[in-house]
């Protein structure tokens, strides 16, 4: 069999899909000591199973600051866990952020998915088998930030921090068996800096990532921004019990934060 490649770069525009404001019942929940909740939107780049919304029980880390100090100043609230329920991110009593008593406005930084390790600087690992369960969406690191506000339910507009890789397969003959696709010799660890909103790969580019199904003959993975290694980084395709087919990139390519890269492989007999 022969494999040839067609590559396409797709710049991801952040298209906000804003949820409606809190219902009257939800507003009633927010009065008094109930604290802050959040509505949310996601940049539309097809890296999630649900592209334009969060899913029930999704969890995020939330940081709060007085004014615009951000991580350069003192944190008002550190890594509070908020959970998505009924179109809102809310928290339990221990984690709920309360408005300052001095009427200061708060600005917020939020990160998906939630982790106790999330901080101004932290390390994040994408899942190595993104075909399993929620591993694909749990690999989709996202960040949101707001201007100072005294709103009881501000909106978090999330953007995707990593690179989205899509592999489309075109077979000369229908595949005789199940198809699986791996990205090989890639980095799976991200060094994140929330203060500067920068995300870069760290560690050796010697890992493999099993991609998730993306529709007929299409597969996808979320990977750290990185520069592929010519003749090393590549795509491995397995059809049924046959020996894997391997394609190595003939030139280096820089995968950038928040951009989707689509590759089409033509597989002859």
Predicted segments, located by residue:
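Sec-type signal peptide cleavage vicinity
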Residues: 2-5, 11-12, 19-269
